[in-house]
Amino acid sequence: MTKHVAVLMGGWSAEREISLRSGKACADALERIGFRVTRINVDRDVAAALVAAKPDVALNLLHGRPGEDGTIQGLLEMAGVPYVGAGVLASAVSLDKEYMKLIFTAHGLPIAPYVVVRDRDWQPGPGAGPAAAAAERKRVFDAIAELGFPVFVKPARGGSSIGTSKAHNQAALIESIEAARRYDPKVIVERAVAGAEIECAVLEGLDGAPPDTSLPGQLVIEGGEEFYDFEAKYLDPSGSMQIPAPVPAAVIDEVRRLAAAAFDAVSCQGFARVDFFYTADGTILVNEINTIPGLTATSYFPKMWEATGLPLPQLLDRMIATALRKRPGSH
């Protein structure tokens, strides 16, 4: 019997356009291999759309909130619709970089030093008074100074590098924090790591087996960007990925081990992409986990799996089959 897949895409986050591109690429691929597909351009009436569609399984490709923070996952759980990917808890903690880092640290995974700047740290309420507000701002600057410049400044709960920038001094830091706060009142400031950016794709293991990992890829940026920002990811034709990453075999093995460990640390399911830094002295640092990586025609998640021997149609078929085998509530 032909399975019916609801592909959820769009939404209202800053990553809407990327989600639509991922949704189209996957819906087209699923139709080519025989699935019946309903494309749902998600708005506030998504619950009604799901009820009307009556799918066998949902493929959630919403980037950012509400698709990656556990909200849509909770809706699907309540509706009794099996779905591909991480559950409510794993989605919520993985999207919030503060809690993601706390979990990684608790599991012994290596990460770069960072500082969390909360709304009340940066902009205390009117009752605080000018002196208290200035003291709180100084505390933030002192904590960041211990990281040392340059630093990366990111919205705590965002993706596709939207709102992320690099600051080389305090004046630029203020601008970067204000820019990140336009997307999230909580901001993460990380010590900039000089090194290669490496990514590894992960799939939930079959029938309870450990996670499977792809050959890692190394990002190659030739357009002059200081880091792999939104433009480099989606708009710059000079950006590319070398698969497998041009690093020693032992590093490939360790990246794959750490990717699986990060996947398990947040209790992820389905699929994810784990990003790393690899420095000249051989240090490997986990940067973050993305529980709904891009699946556009040019995205690196499917490219890494294709290089590992699993093209997009077969990749999606496996992801759907894994979701359909889950017991209700097993997320």
Residue spans for each PLM region:
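ATP-binding N-terminal substructure of ATP-dependent carboxylate-amine bond-forming enzymes
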Residues: 1-106, 118-139, 322-331
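Active-site nucleotide/adenylate-binding loops and adjacent lid/helix of ATP-dependent enzymes
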Residues: 1-9, 52, 93-196, 206-207
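A short small-residue
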Residues: 2-8, 235-244, 300
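ATP-dependent carboxylate activation and anion-phosphoryl transfer catalytic cores
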Residues: 3, 105-108, 248-331
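Hydrophobic beta-strand scaffold residues
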Residues: 37, 82-83, 111, 151, ...
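A short glycine-rich, hydrophobically flanked beta-strand micro-motif that places a catalytic Asp/Glu
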Residues: 39-43, 187, 191, 198-199, ...
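Phosphate-binding site of ATP-dependent enzymes
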Residues: 168-257, 283-285
